[in-house]
Amino acid sequence: MLGQLKTEQKSNEITAIPLLLELLELKGCIVTVDAMGCQTAVAAQIIKQEADYVLSLKGNQGLLHEEVTDYFAWAERINFKDLEYDYCATLEKDHGRIEGRRCWVTEDTEWFTEKAAWAGLRSFIMVEAEREVLGQAPSVERRYFISSLAADAKQALRAVRGHWQVENSLHWVLDVAFREDACRTRTGHAPENLATLRHIAVNLLKQERSCKLGVKSKRLKAVMPQLCAEEWRNIISASKVWSG
């Protein structure tokens, strides 16, 4: 977690994302944003800061998601014949689970009538994830993205997977190790302050590599010396009272 910004009561993530981006040094980076942040203002801000973007598409962007979905469906029907595109595939097997991913990237964007509204738009991306778990029916999911990157399928897939891993890992750690969802603090700036402290703690704990422990166990280890010291103080205090 590099930064966060509290949204106003009558605002939302859409208006907050460009403001948050301004706080970060992004030059030369690839910025991935979920579907809510797939906005022309967000794309423009990222390009302004000399970075690249991979923005997730869903139905919240009018016809954009439908148009990109239809484009890739058509491209598949003609087997991408005469189209400029790049493709890669990965396969991972682990403990009764098989995960395959395929990625197509094309720079064929001239057909998109709203291209000028999206700063730096250079490519469309389709990622297919197929998962087989022992004893369960296979599942297939396709996701679509717009990007300022050139047609490099391996690079695009790394960016997309990195986004999923960070998002899933961070949310899981905050919920399981820090019990964020159970927190009922609602007064004043307390929720924002506590969230900031949690994110700082997560960053510090993940940088601690002297022991092979999970974040939750690292938290416990970090406070153990303090707990022991407190326990000894109590013992000493009790002994003084007893001797007195």
Q: What feature does the model see in each segment?
A:
Residues 81, 173-244:
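A short, flexible helix-boundary coil/loop motif
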Residues 58-162:
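An anionic, glycine-rich sequence signature occurring as long contiguous blocks
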Residues 150-185:
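Short amphipathic alpha-helical "interface-anchor" segments enriched in bulky aromatics
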Residues 1-29:
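Electropositive, glycine- and tryptophan-enriched low-complexity nucleic-acid-binding patches
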Residues 43-51, 73:
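Short, surface-exposed basic-aromatic patches at helix termini and helix-loop junctions that form
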Residues 17, 30-38, 53, 145, ...:
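Short, conserved catalytic/metal-binding motifs centered on acidic residues
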Residues 14, 39-43:
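Short, well-ordered alpha-helical microsegments
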